[in-house]
Amino acid sequence: MMRKFFLGILLVASMGILSGCLVTDNHDEYERQQFRSTEEISEISVTDSSTNYTLQVSDTEELLVEYSDSPTQSWYNIDVADGTLKIEKTQGTVGVEENSVIITLPEKEYQSIAIETSNGDITFENVFSDKYKCSVENGDITGTLNGSEADYLIVVKTENGDSNLKDNVIESSKRIEFNVENGDIDISFTK
């Protein structure tokens, strides 16, 4: 009887270990990568999951994207085409410690910045755009936008969190749409 009990425990433990190996990806090996471009861009479009994003400006003419990636099989498609920087994660990165993307942009006004991520924060550092459309399931949207809050039509939605931005329904070609399910919105403006 005792032998059957131990065999049962061994069988259950083996199934648990094997199912864990099948469900999770092994991302122990990764390295920080850089994507650079001197092509003129006016729009940024990001679709990702489980990644923190920081957008910052610099007095350079070069676009720089810093990110963690596998040395053998890329997790990202990053491209500049028709004036748009597109970043798309092609597979999950569970277990990656330095799981952040830092986008350094030439200092100018952009037409549109759209970022969608599930688990991660979005941080702006003095970025200037006519339109912002950002969505986060579990994370925060924070930082400083270059411009004046009064110039933007603003629509914010937080389900389980707080926002220092309030809806501002005005006639304007400039627009901010921020949607956070579980997290906060804390944005300031330079003017």
Predicted regions and their residues:
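Positively charged n-region of N-terminal signal peptides that target proteins for export
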Residues: 1-5, 9
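Short, surface-exposed interaction patches in beta-rich subdomains
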Residues: 124-191
